[in-house]
Amino acid sequence: MFSAGHKIKGTVVLMPKNELEVNPDGSAVDNLNAFLGRSVSLQLISATKADAHGKGKVGKDTFLEGINTSLPTLGAGESAFNIHFEWDGSMGIPGAFYIKNYMQVEFFLKSLTLEAISNQGTIRFVCNSWVYNTKLYKSVRIFFANHTYVPSETPAPLVSYREEELKSLRGNGTGERKEYDRIYDYDVYNDLGNPDKSEKLARPVLGGSSTFPYPRRGRTGRGPTVTDPNTEKQGEVFYVPRDENLGHLKSKDALEIGTKSLSQIVQPAFESAFDLKSTPIEFHSFQDVHDLYEGGIKLPRDVISTIIPLPVIKELYRTDGQHILKFPQPHVVQVSQSAWMTDEEFAREMIAGVNPCVIRGLEEFPPKSNLDPAIYGDQSSKITADSLDLDGYTMDEALGSRRLFMLDYHDIFMPYVRQINQLNSAKTYATRTILFLREDGTLKPVAIELSLPHSAGDLSAAVSQVVLPAKEGVESTIWLLAKAYVIVNDSCYHQLMSHWLNTHAAMEPFVIATHRHLSVLHPIYKLLTPHYRNNMNINALARQSLINANGIIETTFLPSKYSVEMSSAVYKNWVFTDQALPADLIKRGVAIKDPSTPHGVRLLIEDYPYAADGLEIWAAIKTWVQEYVPLYYARDDDVKNDSELQHWWKEAVEKGHGDLKDKPWWPKLQTLEDLVEVCLIIIWIASALHAAVNFGQYPYGGLIMNRPTASRRLLPEKGTPEYEEMINNHEKAYLRTITSKLPTLISLSVIEILSTHASDEVYLGQRDNPHWTSDSKALQAFQKFGNKLKEIEEKLVRRNNDPSLQGNRLGPVQLPYTLLYPSSEEGLTFRGIPNSISI
């Protein structure tokens, strides 16, 4: 195969750590020269020839030789080096390699390519990993070729290497993690509070109890606070396994700098400006809000000079040199400044807005509560049938023809309304909204119920008032405010449950379990890991700056210190299998099973943009997974007997989602069908579900009047100055009720970042490396998947251009539903499905 003294030519591609800091004075070459000499060594490991211990033979230490400037495929910041390995026939075929970094600075290893291997052609190693000084590791760093093997089919000389690498990633569960560590482990959410700083910043531990169940997050090993041994102390940097912290990516860079800047610099700067009365503390008219995009907001010179030098903030804010900050105009007002106020748009956003996955079919009237009457008394709805305008239908007819729907936040908010209303500047209701499906296929709201806990105590039942649609007089202002209370409930549920809990937090246990138990050689590892990209990192950043005590979420959203605790209450009823789109639609009563339809379900709202478009994406993902899995598993027994796979799923359920481990709905992972279902749901959550609830945040919520995050006062009573204000100045009354100016500026700053695609985003149907596997059949199936997504995008464009679908697809604001278009350019595009929860 190889003659004695044969050499294998290789190319190593890497990124120096300081690539982005390099000056344009030629020092880049000097930095690259540092990799030459005896700075970085590699040793090939045989996949076919074993030593006396049964392990693949290891070749000689070989060092990088020279800079390769002619490689055409290099990306930005990447550098290529030549290397020649001594290798002969007695060593067999290389299947892995060791690498040692003798420098003091780490680098990002992209790949190794071996050329002209006899009978093998090119062998590729896709690495994508930070490599630190070798003394920092307990075992030598190893990388495997891009072949795919279930455990039982691993070449015998590689078996122990495969097992040892997984063991090193699991760690031993002790000690504080360091920056260079690669260890994946679990912990509860016990680091959101900071009781050492103030008892007001203490927060309950989420996870590990029936009171506050929660998914697990990555373990950092930081010690406890002095005040509370159950709370983990804060740190300057929150550890994530090193390869989860994608420091070489623009998306990660933008997110980290942006959110930290907002929480640590911009928020205090805004606060100082308001304290100094240098900018008005309230919006006085709707035009004041529109001025954020048209004229900008004037801030003191020192505030501007504090903010603008920050790299991401420079992009975030537009300044004309006159101490004016401007936000981009949200999509929802780009055609009309007032269409957001219509009942049609209020209803449409429940099926085509940023939170389109909560509305339910109403199957009985009046609506009932599931709250325990022994604790909360009578929580039944006070809405009466004869008060509703059902376009000539009786209540029985409307129910029988499945034309009634409900946005129901009553049971979720009622247990917290009393505590929330005791907070400073927070006043709200638990809401129910009844909607009627008209003959033209659009929804109209017919009643809103606003409920408060009784002043005599919870057992005395709810105090409710029903508000009906009105077009004129003070009643129209009351109706507008009632819709605002609904949207405040919806905004909070969206951010904390639909977005944070159901995508970000629910995904992290699967990320951890995958790296602990599935080798990089495993077919399911190769299938799923693109959908984990940056998830742990953004979640750690959220714990540090967004969902932490007195962080951006608590500062800008109604529930304040109860925000994340409320998501724990919702997690009690989280069901993994219900995250599947068809199951979700059926459970919510907005679809019924129908085998005669392309996707097996029939929508009760015929053009429900999120559901209709989502089912197309769901079906494409399902086909891809159904074609990929049988390439490696021929029978159910193959799934049962895959030791890595079984350990992965057992731990994901029993540790990662341990508070729900005894629920009967978990798939048992005993069949091919189980495996397809599990992978399909994970990919759906990470890609399309997250895209649907994330990238519309600024397009819809950038207009705070359309998506208020808080309410500050209840409906005024007759005879009060506030009631007179409703009569005489409905704009001022509305603005005094919803989110005030300072939290609006902070909120808009955050959601603009969160709604923006980075230039290096990787979208569904794409991979960041075309050589992610050597399996040609898998590559062909993946190409087919990508082509199908392009077809779907064309289909969705046609739907949005269909005159018969304009009511739900464009609505009064004339904003087409594009959130589930698979592709996107960079920027604030209101479209695009990234592979993962990367922002």
UniProtKB/Swiss-Prot annotation:
Q: Which reaction does it catalyse?
A: (9Z,12Z)-octadecadienoate + O2 = (13S)-hydroperoxy-(9Z,11E)-octadecadienoate; (9Z,12Z,15Z)-octadecatrienoate + O2 = (13S)-hydroperoxy-(9Z,11E,15Z)-octadecatrienoate; (4Z,7Z,10Z,13Z,16Z,19Z)-docosahexaenoate + O2 = (17S)-hydroperoxy-(4Z,7Z,10Z,13Z,15E,19Z)-docosahexaenoate; (4Z,7Z,10Z,13Z,16Z)-docosapentaenoate + O2 = (17S)-hydroperoxy-(4Z,7Z,10Z,13Z,15E)-docosapentaenoate
The effect of H517Q is: 33% of wild-type activity
Q: Which GO terms describe its molecular function?
A: iron ion binding; linoleate 13S-lipoxygenase activity; linolenate 9R-lipoxygenase activity; oxidoreductase activity, acting on single donors with incorporation of molecular oxygen, incorporation of two atoms of oxygen
Query: What pH-related activity note exists for this entry?
Result: Inactive below pH 6.0.
UniProt domain PLAT: residue ranges: 16-145
Q: How is the cofactor bound?
A: Binds 1 Fe cation per subunit. Iron is tightly bound.
Question: Which parts of the sequence belong to the Lipoxygenase domain?
Answer: 148-839
In the record, the effect of Q697 to N/E is given as:
Reduces catalytic activity
Induction of this protein: by what?
The hydroperoxide product serves to activate the resting enzyme. The activation is accompanied by the oxidation of Fe(2+)entadiene structure.
Source domain of life: Eukaryota
**Cofactor dependence:** Fe cation
Where is the segment annotated Disordered? Answer: 212-234
Effect of mutating L546A: Reduces catalytic efficiency more than 14000-fold
Top-rank EC class of the record's enzyme: oxidoreductase
Q: Which family does it belong to?
A: Belongs to the lipoxygenase family.
Q: What is this protein called?
A: Seed linoleate 13S-lipoxygenase-1
